[in-house]
């Protein structure tokens, strides 16, 4: 190896690849009549790393996690919703078991089990789907059903969902075919009316019809790298029968539909069963009794419901559950903000009464867990704005009055005599 030295003849040495002289680089490595500099070595290493990344096949998990293992992992990130976790764990396990062993077992064709999640806003539907995909190490994408329209109309084509999934895995079709697709707001594409109309329902029943084949299983033709479709183009062929579809929605008003069905036939007169106010079922209890006929009455077409055989219901989160969500999961909101403050070298403390106040505020807003972040962000905004410009702050304390907007977080400085309250 030559390190910025001339060879025996006293000639100046140059890199055989980039042409730089030994004085322009840090190291020059000599071979038989050739030289390579440290910069070219680094560049070669980068090229090789990129090639390996592109060529290396996606490695599947050596063993499929059991329903118990899937459930335990969900427990680490999602508070409550135990019945839904159990249903999801079994459905996901059966889906990937079918993929690993082919679509048939001993000559028996195994059906596809897509999932329908019913639950109020902020109850954890999206989080459950995301956590599953992350745990199983499979591509995941989300779609909003309200943006979808039938092909040929202004809006998003249903096949764009598959294109998004392909983008998540660099257009690797094999990877995409093991992925999970979560379609949110599925209740918003319910049929607008029971009566046939002259005008076409392109964002309601029309979208349900368009999604049917995609969810059940078809070969979707997707243009490569997001190009527009044209006749001479070669398309990527994606088998959607191997993709797990999870559809979710709040289904506001479905509890009333279920209640009407349950109460129908209770009769009137002397033989009627009269229920007291205390016996009235809650919204969550009613949703757990959902039948296909209720979903049809709500506005989903029978064929669409048939493609979603696994139904899991999620309850509205209680105040206690929201407090748990704030502090217990691995990526709990309070832990996230504490990590953020730690980057400034400052400790962040949430008093218990502050957590209770945050939960009460979210309950009043009826936004579930989804509203927690905006409440915490609002309470800490001024502090996060001022903190990088301040010196000697060691600790920030958030109590109930901060959440109520009555005072600013308490700032504790390095010197005891310098305690002050942030403004």
From Swiss-Prot:
Q: Give the top-rank taxon of the lineage listed in the UniProt record for this protein.
A: Bacteria
Q: Which PROSITE patterns match?
A: CLPX_ZB
Role according to the record: ATP-dependent specificity component of the Clp protease. It directs the protease to specific substrates. Can perform chaperone functions in the absence of ClpP.
- Which residue intervals define the domain ClpX-type ZB in the entry? 2-56
Q: Which family does it belong to?
A: Belongs to the ClpX chaperone family.
| Positions of ATP binding | 120-127
Could you name the Gene Ontology cellular component terms for this entry?
Answer: HslUV protease complex
Keyword Cell inner membrane annotated: no
Q: What is this protein called?
A: ATP-dependent Clp protease ATP-binding subunit ClpX
Residues binding Zn(2+): 15, 18, 37, 40
InterPro entries to which the protein is assigned, alphabetical: AAA+_ATPase, ATP-dep_Clp_protease_ClpX, ATPase_AAA_core, Clp_ATPase_C, Clp_protease_ATP-bd_su_ClpX, ClpX_bact, P-loop_NTPase, Znf_CppX_C4
- Tell me how this protein assembles: Component of the ClpX-ClpP complex. Forms a hexameric ring that, in the presence of ATP, binds to fourteen ClpP subunits assembled into a disk-like structure with a central cavity, resembling the structure of eukaryotic proteasomes.
- Give the gene name: clpX
Which keywords does UniProt give here? ATP-binding, Chaperone, Metal-binding, Nucleotide-binding, Zinc
Entry GO MF terms: ATP binding; ATP hydrolysis activity; ATP-dependent protein folding chaperone; protein dimerization activity; unfolded protein binding; zinc ion binding
Species whose genome carries this gene: Yersinia enterocolitica serotype O:8 / biotype 1B (strain NCTC 13174 / 8081)
Any one biological process term the GO annotation gives: proteolysis involved in protein catabolic process
Task: Decide whether keyword Membrane is in the record.
Answer: no
